[in-house]
Amino acid sequence: MDPYLLLKAIGFFLLVIIGIPGNMFIIIQFVLVKIIEKKLLPTNIILTMLATANLLVIFSRIIFQLLNAIGLEDLLDESECKFMIFTYRVSRAMSIGITSLLSCHQCILLAPSTKVWSYLKQKVSQNAMTIIIILCVLLISMYSYTILISHARKNTTSSPYTLHLIYCDADFVTYTSYTVNGTFYLLRDLILVTLMILSSIYIVYTLLQHERNVRGIRSSDRGQKSSAEYKASRAVILLVALYVILFGLDNSMWVYMLTLSYVNPNMNEIRVFLTSSYASLSPILIIITNPKLKNKLKYSYAKKTLPKNATNNGLVFSISKSDNKDTIR
């Protein structure tokens, strides 16, 4: 097997085995919280929907990249190609949009309690799911054109403005439609990334102010609540940093490719790997920075590894009790 193909197969295989269990764990745990506690904090609603969007990215793109890397050809017919490309475009845009919403929501939570900010805090927190649904409907409408331009790969000569997407092609036919599509993608990502960065800058500034002001009151109830708020903020910053790094690497390669007269297909594969990595790597950050999820994972691990008599004596039960003290958003 060609060394590059082997490396590509291993890379996409790692994304699959990390991404699917990680996103599924987040979704299942927060669904259980909703069922048991009858409520779910707005931030956790956003994280659940982010994990759902990431899971769709994995199923609609990364798995097919893996299958292609190990040599499986011509797996999708015309209708399946349309569905796969449409699902990938919408779910990837949802993943970016929800990450941006998460950073903006956390920024609003940390904003001063003025009349305007208090109103925004209440409205955004109460309508987090509604905002996500509106975003989803908007993106479905915007990407409906992909159904028309997508088709299974053919042996005939394709248009010079055709994007080759694993088993399928997206044919834009004209230079104008090709450039409009590329410009739209770039502007969309730039706007959302700019919102993420601006929100994160404000969060970092607020965190620094917080460190100076609450050193003496960390033991109080207010200090504990505030500490939970700011731990959640740090988690959001890490997620944004991960996306911005991957976005920067991806678009740096894209700009470089524009300067070349001939683009090696391997460079496109690397870009796909970078753009898809967020869907698999972000669950790791979410789990290790969210105490509720982290404690659930520790409890599940302890339950499997402790002897049966230790479980019966209540050692595992004591671990699960500590999980109920978690107050983080």
What is the meaning of each model-derived region?
Residues 1-329:
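Transmembrane helical core of 7TM receptor-like proteins
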